[in-house]
Regions:
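Bacterial N-terminal signal peptides that target proteins for export
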Residues: 2-17
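Short sequence/structural segments immediately N-terminal
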Residues: 3, 25-429
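Bacterial N-terminal signal peptides
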Residues: 14-26
Length: 429
């Protein structure tokens, strides 16, 4: 036998002996381990500062995963002596004041985010009056389960904020008690361009949620003069280009002066129901623009203050453009096609789309009247069709009116005649 064979044989014998030893000794070792007492698992230490007395009754499951996991119970709760043997503290503890020791420093870069601003908000003022329905810190942020705002599981993460606000603002008892004009803001928001962007397109980091418009801790009531939710500058944070146009328009300049007569963004686009102009039901859709503008321009008491005739909407509706829009023509010009959208200016302003020098360009756009003679643009646009207007327009209007009546009458007479003749015909077997 060669030396190599001898070595291999020796290795095989050693491996076999080792395997036999394992098979014989393993059951004995396992049995010994089973009979050996297992030491008790050490109890999980209580969070820092939490007394054993608290843990005897209260679990820490939710607190352990929150931003306040390292805090002690007494950091938030004022522990009063108990009145009986079963409860080591008073049955009802004083409400927690989050701004007493921790959240009291103002946020200098974004004052609205400062929890201290809550005291002057519509919720904080209600709390001072003793109102029991107003939102406290924990109603929005949670109680022991508070998580960072950027955590998707946080109740105040951007995607969850509309639902949190709806707990109160879609509660009809609260709405009626405090005369809140928006009865179903959450349902309206969910159907708006903002709500669809958040929940259908996943744009919670970009599309507006409640706090972007109304504020965070500094939420104001309806009666506030400079209410954030109606301020065009609020919309301008997301729509800076549009706000820049609006700011230089006749409406924007007056709005920034505090003039309450001029339309703000929400007056034309809506509040929680903001929809795309392509949506047929939107107040800014092609067909609905005249009705939206009439909210101001058909009110004599407002128009009189600024020397503007209050018949502008009516005369437009009676014009060829207005009639075509009423019949569903989506390509016909409406108010915004001629006057502008966010850049509306008085007709005497050289930058206005309806300034005399700019009408050829405005009316001659592709899709409207390209190549139209400049002389035609000098004609009056909002022309009265009655006796107060021009004689030519009045005569044409009357001719067309009587022609329409005649055609309608002839159609009715012919229909009745044919129906009578049909009934008189003998029935064929």
């Amino acid at each position: 036998m060669s030396p190599l064979s001898i070595i291999r044989t020796a290795r095989g014998l050693a491996a076999g002996m080792a395997l036999a030893a394992v098979l014989v000794l393993a059951p004995q070792f396992t049995k010994a381990q089973a009979t050996k007492p297992v030491p008790a698992r050490p109890a999980k230490p209580a969070p820092a500062g939490m007394s054993a007395a608290c843990l005897a009754c209260h679990k820490t499951n939710t607190l352990e995963g929150s931003v306040h996991a390292a805090m002690a119970c007494q950091d938030c709760h004022t522990i009063l002596p108990g009145e009986g043997k079963d409860v080591p503290h008073a049955k009802t503890l004083p409400p927690v004041d989050c701004t007493a020791a921790c959240h009291r420093e103002p946020n200098r870069t974004q004052p609205g985010l400062s929890p201290a601003a809550y005291a002057d908000s519509v919720h904080g003022q209600g709390l001072k009056r003793g109102e029991k329905d107003v939102a406290h810190c924990w109603d929005c942020h949670g109680k022991h389960n508070i998580k960072p705002v950027l955590d998707p599981a946080s109740v105040v993460s951007r995607k969850n904020i509309p639902l949190v606000c709806s707990r109160c603002h879609e509660n009809m008892n609260v709405i009626i008690k405090y005369n809140i004009h928006a009865e179903s803001p959450y349902q309206e928001y969910m159907k708006s361009v903002h709500g669809r962007a958040v929940y259908e397109k996943g744009l919670a980091g970009f599309a507006a949620v409640c706090t972007d418009c109304h504020g965070v801790h500094n939420i104001q009531g309806v009666g506030e003069i400079h209410k954030q939710a109606r301020n065009p500058e609020t919309c301008g944070k997301c729509h800076p280009v549009i706000f820049a146009e609006y700011k230089d328009s006749i409406h924007g300049r007056e709005a920034l002066k505090g003039n309450i007569d001029v339309p703000l963004c929400v007056d034309c686009h809506g509040e929680h129901t903001v929809a795309s102009p392509r949506d047929i039901g939107a107040p800014t859709s092609k067909k609905n623009i005249p009705d939206t503008c009439s909210g101001c321009h058909a009110r004599p008491e407002i128009m009189k203050k600024y020397g503007i005739p209050a018949d502008r909407i009516r005369t437009f509706i009676e014009s060829f453009h207005g009639i075509a829009i009423g019949l569903g023509d989506k390509a016909e010009a409406n108010c915004s096609d001629c006057h502008g959208v966010h850049n509306i200016r008085p007709a005497i302003d050289p930058a206005s789309m309806v300034h005399a020098d700019n009408l050829p360009k405005t009316c001659g756009r592709p899709g409207c009247h390209p190549g139209m003679p400049e002389k035609i643009t000098k004609a009056k646009i909002h022309r009265e069709t009655g006796v107060k207007g021009s004689a030519t327009s009045y005569v044409i209007f009357k001719i067309l009116l009587w022609a329409l009546i005649a055609v309608a009458a002839i159609t009715i007479v012919r229909f009745v005649f044919e129906l009578t003749q049909k009934r008189r015909r003998p029935k064929t077997p």
